[in-house]
Amino acid sequence: MGKVSFGFLGLMLVVVVIGVVECRRFEKETLGGGGGGGLGGGFGGGKGFGGGIGAGGGFGGGAGGGAGGGLGGGAGGGGGIGGGAGGGAGGGLGGGAGGGLGGGHGGGIGGGAGGGAGGGLGGGHGGGIGGGAGGGSGGGLGGGIGGGAGGGAGGGGGLGGGHGGGIGGGAGGGAGGGLGGGHGGGIGGGAGGGSGGGLGGGIGGGAGGGAGGGGGAGGGGGLGGGHGGGFGGGAGGGLGGGAGGGTGGGFGGGAGGGAGGGAGGGFGGGAGGGAGGGFGGGAGGGAGGGAGGGFGGGAGGGHGGGVGGGFGGGSGGGFGGGAGGGAGGGAGGGFGGGGGAGGGFGGGF
């Protein structure tokens, strides 16, 4: 009586230690913050809710948690600092799958609903700083409003890349790269744009653009490439070009040119441009337009147009072109030459 063996005391100590460990484990599984608490826990705590470093919330994580949490969490995952509802695992600022600052679905600083997968600063579908709902794949600073149904897989890259990307890119955007590149991209690119975009993009551009098309390196024109692109081009424009434009555009591009329009346009080209355009392109061209256009070509340009070519021009026009040419115009045209098959220096009509 009254005697307690050291063996019994040791056994009791082991039981107490095991009990404490099991209680703490049970507490974590049922009440804790997923992976270790964190500042502010989560909304409702528990497995998968809010939580700390590891799975779930983080600093004030929301209901639903998710792996990677951060400041604000969000329902259904959405780690990262300030992750919104629906975020994913590994988020940065804005949460979402994909990591990086603002990466992942809806990521980016304040990324919109829907977002997408991606990384970098605001990358991923819809990402970017303040990316819009739905966004395109690759987003950039400003993202896009929706980028069309399904967005574009693997697009993006560069500042503002991806559908609608670019710094403040318009709706529709595209899948290019560079500074505002991609469909419609560019700094402030328009809605729809062409598939090569540059600074300024286009309002509608044409299908195809990008590699191979018209002037500049890599098709579609230099700054503002893509079909009709150019420096700040509108739909097909060049520097202030008109609607429709050509494929390569110079400064000014062409405005449309009947069914098919011209392919080149020049400096201030008219409606229909030619296909290779010089400075000015052609103004009409009919169905398909002409192939050359010269400096300030006329309204119908031929295959070569000259400086100021007239209506209907010939196919090789010289300096000044002619005014008539008949159905098909002439083949040569000289300095101010008109229609006819050979036209000389100042030839007739």
Swiss-Prot record:
Key words, A-Z: Cell wall, Cell wall biogenesis/degradation, Repeat, Secreted, Signal
Main location: secreted
Region forming the signal peptide: 1-23
Keyword Repeat attributed: yes
Record localization: Secreted, Cell wall
One GO CC term on file: extracellular region
Biological process, per Gene Ontology: cell wall organization
Protein role: Responsible for plasticity of the cell wall.
The protein's name: Glycine-rich cell wall structural protein
Lineage start: Eukaryota, Viridiplantae, Streptophyta, Embryophyta, Tracheophyta
